[in-house]
Swiss-Prot record:
It comes from the Bacteria. The gene is rplW. This is Large ribosomal subunit protein uL23. Belongs to the universal ribosomal protein uL23 family. The keyword S-adenosyl-L-methionine does not apply. It comes from Prochlorococcus marinus (strain MIT 9312).
Length: 100
């Protein structure tokens, strides 16, 4: 792949989601990431495979509703987020936590 294509794929994945539910899903070889809200499932799959050198079996996405935040009398909305749950092939693993 070209470097330009790789840099665009790197912009698709924002950060891993570390919650109790996401950590429990690691046992099922499922990893949860926050991704760009414009990204489609094939783009997310290509980005994960290129960045982590793993084989992706399936991608599930969700667009949770935007949350309203208040600061004093001013009300606003948080930025749009999209979550992707990525299922990897048997034997593949992504190192999210450093080994100690």
């Amino acid at each position: 792949m070209s470097k330009l294509f790789d840099s665009r794929l790197a912009d698709v994945i924002r950060k891993p989601v570390i919650t109790e539910k996401a950590t429990n899903a690691l046992d099922l070889n499922q990893y949860t990431f926050e991704v760009d809200h414009r990204a489609a499932k094939p783009q997310i799959k290509a980005a994960i495979e290129a960045l982590f050198s793993v084989k992706v079996i399936g991608v599930n996405t969700m667009n949770p509703p935007r949350r309203t935040r208040r600061v004093g009398k001013f009300s606003g909305k948080r930025s749009q987020v999209k979550k992707a749950i990525v299922r990897l092939a048997e034997g593949d693993k992504i190192q999210l936590f450093p080994e100690s």
